[in-house]
């Protein structure tokens, strides 16, 4: 036992992490520590940015998914994910989080979700596939880059270029303003050429 939680067997989902004391809403339940950098997404990967995947050390990697989780995610100073209570947790209760709180896409769980929650989505999905009301419910308890991607996508749909946090247009996505300026210059050149030929 360590820090208010321990590993136990569950009835249907193998091992899980269970609280050995109570936790209040907003209280840090587990502190994340990055154990290794990964080159791709998989069942135990935590996504820290659009292209960065890591493996968390300790029992945090054993926390099971739930479509109605009692924990969410906050980034700590090292960039790892801490698990924070989003509901009161009592001693003996399983500590859970939604895998969509840390990964934009989840494609490695083909079987049906086994969380047993009344709000079960039937399959484990990533943030990208969450309904908007669930995203709103999780606000403040997800990896920040997930909401950054949503904001960027909304900006793109509105016709603005995709930018990084500093507001710089991404090189792989052309700036529509630059394209429009180029179109105006080309049109001006054609008019000038037509006038000079007349």
Regions found by a protein language model. Give the residues of each.
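Conserved catalytic SET/PR domain of SAM-dependent protein methyltransferases, capturing the structural core
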Residues: 1-198
